[in-house]
Amino acid sequence: MQDEPTVTELIKAVADFLRNEIVPEIKGHNAFKLRVGINALDLVTRQLTLAQESDAAEAARLKQLLGIDGALIDLNRALSAKIAAGEVDLQTPGLAEHLWQTTMDKLAVDQPNYASYKRELGNK
């Protein structure tokens, strides 16, 4: 693929075209289905834009919490096992902050218009 436009820019352009040009022309259930598709494209755009950085930050926090290295999925499995075994809990230094930041990062991708998420961003 060429350097410009990027994959993210292409997906955003398609979503914007559908939202601005096609949605107003469609009614009823088909308009609803089209909006679902547009929302999926918007989610993919956010995933491509935000996920790499938030995943790297999550992995760094997990490495510090657990004292081990590994892939993000393996680090999360290790944390889950330690929580299930009672080896770590919310009193463990850094765990609550890690869980909160991970949740906020995931909401930024999945549900950026979620009222509680937006309210929490406003509290910072």
List the model feature ranges, each with a label.
Residues 2-6, 22-29, 33, 64, ...:
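Non-transmembrane, amphipathic alpha-helical segments
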Residues 39-49, 70, 103-107:
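Short alpha-helix boundary/capping elements
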Residues 4, 8-14, 58-124:
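C-terminal amphipathic alpha-helical interaction region
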Residues 17-47:
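N-terminal interaction modules that seed assembly of large macromolecular complexes
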Residues 47-63:
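Short, charged early-sequence alpha-helical segments and their helix-coil boundaries
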